[in-house]
Each structure stands twice: as structure tokens, then as C-alpha cells.
Amino acid sequence: MTRFADWLETTPAWLIGLILVAAMFGASLLGEWLKRRTSTAKGDDEEGGREGYIVSATLGLLALLMGFTFSLAVDRFEARRLLVLEEANAIGTTYLRTQMLEPVDRARISKMLVDYTDNRILLAKAPLDQIPALLAKNDQMLTDLWTATLAAWPSIKGLDFSSSYLETMNNMIDLDSARKAARLARVPSAVFFVLFVYVITSAGVLGYAGANKEGRGATAFLFLLLAISLLLTLDIDRPRSGRITESQAPMERLRATLASQPPEVFDRMSAPKATATPAAPP
């Protein structure tokens, strides 16, 4: 099953679609051939009625299985989409609270958060061959962020917001793990394998029931619809290589906000530091 999962992940969707349609046509022709070999002149009407029930039941079960698989894929897609928004909010909150640190720590961590946001956006859109390097850079950035937080801790540990700042930074780091887990949470490959087998078997049942006699054009159209439905489900379940992926708009809006709000922006309402006035000579 691991090989099948790898094949689903690495094979282009259009090629999977061609193979699936060809397999359905082959199964349909095989079913038609078996029908001719086993059919008898007597009792055709009664047998045709039984075949109609079998075809209806087969297609009904196929619709149920495809709907179940599509629901699994959409649920996982929605979870990934919500995590993007949560992470953008967490990074933004951390950035704002960073402005309360000492100037040196504030400048350093603010710059690191901007770079981290850039890398997160690249990581979500990168092709498969670039992901390992970006992941390694991502993990190193998180280590550096926590190291910088520890360096800033002595200057804030006595302040009221120190605990909430640590909590915010921890939450941001935890969301990195949550997004990684969400991208690995896929529809089990065994479900897709059973679905592929069932689709091909259903095509064979249709061929045996004489669907090809009604016109191969209609049969081809049905097979095309089934293949498109299955490929849509498969594409939604491909967070790295699919065309339908979770939007990075929250992260991109955050990046634009960070670019427009460097640390110096937050100093414009601060009271100027009082300068010592030299004492008048006696």
C-alpha cells in the first residue's frame, strides 16, 4: 500500500485520469464479453430486470463511497486552511508584543519574525524538490527565535506581560507542528485503492448489464464524470502537489502589514526621554 500511496503522490493527475478511464473502458468491454458468453436466449427479460437492480445498487454504493472519500478530503483541506489563519494571527500577535521588548531584542526578534513569515509563505508554495531545504531552514529559524527569546527574558521577567509573551511565542511554535501534522493527515491510501477498484468494477458491471448497447458515447461520458470526480477528490487531498491548495492570503496580508509597520513605527507616540539639564553655576 505504501507504493500505491507514493504513486498517487508523484504521478500527475492527468496521467492518473487517463489510466483510470482506460481501465474503466477495459472493464466495461470485459463485462460485455462475459455477458455474451453467459447469456441465453431464454429468460432474458427476467435476467435484465435483475441486472437493473444490481446496477442501481452498485452505482448507489459507488456514490456513497465517493461521497465519503470527498468528505474526508474536504475536512482535511478545511483544517489546513484554518491553521493558516491561526498561524498568521499568532505571528502577528507575537510581532506586536515584541515591540514591548528592549530596543536591541525588539529589533532582532522583529526581523526574525519577518524572515520567518517569508519562509512560511515560500514553504507553502514550493515545489516538492525544494521543500526539504525550506523545512530545514524553517526549523532553524524556530530554534533561533526561541534562543533570542531566552536572551531577552532577563530584561522582561519582572514585567507583567512576560508570561503572555512566552505563551504567544510558544503558541506560534506549536502551530508550526500543527501545520506539519495537518499536511501529513491525508485520506488513507487504502481508501483510494478501494475506490479505484470499486470504480473499475462498477464499469465492468455496467458493461455486463449492456450499458454499451445504449451507446458508447453515453458510457464514455459517464466514465469521464467518474474520473473527474475522483481526480477532484485526489487533488484536494494533495496539499503539496495539488492544484487546489489552502490559500496563503492571511500570511500574505500579514507580510504586507509587517512590511508597513517596522519597529520604528511604534515609537512615534512614545514620550521623548528627558535629558539632564546642567546645573547653574553658583
Spans of model-derived segments:
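Short extracytoplasmic/periplasmic juxtamembrane "stem" segments immediately C-terminal to an N-terminal membrane anchor
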Residues: V84-M100, S247-Q261
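A generic, lipid-embedded transmembrane alpha helix
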Residues: G52-F70
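Transmembrane signal-anchor/signal-peptide helices with a preference for the extracytoplasmic
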Residues: L64-L85, D237-R238
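Hydrophobic alpha-helical segments
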Residues: M1-T10
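Structured inter-helical modules in multipass membrane proteins
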Residues: T94-R183
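Alpha-helical transmembrane anchor segments
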Residues: E9-S39, A181-P272
